[in-house]
């Protein structure tokens, strides 16, 4: 969770969206104040967001090492349950810290929601994994035209409460294969939105802040 202190009453203001807001209303004194000095707070650990970003590569490396150690522990019957639980909590804390370092809040989908991806003049149906005003993660089976990193694609989506479909130009940042044993080849694709227009930004921000995932009626346009 992201936190900042109200300059008026000194109370703690919490919001997962602080990194995208220039001002926020304090729940204690009801004053609208400027967002400054944002902290990332996890269970038992708090760090200034700027300090975290300055050391982000170290925390990413630490997470990889802890996850590797946890994997080895899973195959070691001499490791106590308490130790395993502690490492699980440590991994969770590091994940929360890295999530707080992001420039945009990511809304993770809790149901299967599909979009249309236009890539190199081909249209494909893809599943939305998470989304922010900065980009998204999508999932699809192996395609003849599977986009590569740096490729430009267009995502077509229809959001609840908005009559017109949104068309978002995006650049592929990474592509990862998810399955090894299964017959179906599943891939996850991370994209960054390019020149998102004001209407699209407003629509996505509304979806994210309202958290209306369960009642959403996403569909491919």
Question: Which role does the model predict for each range below?
Answer:
Residues 118, 133, 175-181:
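Short, conserved beta-turn/loop elements at beta-strand boundaries and strand-helix junctions
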Residues 195, 201-208:
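Well-ordered alpha/beta subsegment
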Residues 113, 126, 170-173, 191:
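Small-residue-enriched segments and motifs
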Residues 137-140, 178-192:
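Short, solvent-exposed secondary-structure boundary/capping segments
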Residues 107-108, 121-123, 159-169:
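Short coil-to-beta-strand transition motifs
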Residues 1-141, 206-221:
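N-terminal helix initiation/capping motif
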Residues 109-114, 146-158:
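Short coil-to-beta transition motif at edge beta-strands of beta-rich domains
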Residues 130, 172-174, 195:
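A residue-level detector for short acidic-glycine micro-motifs
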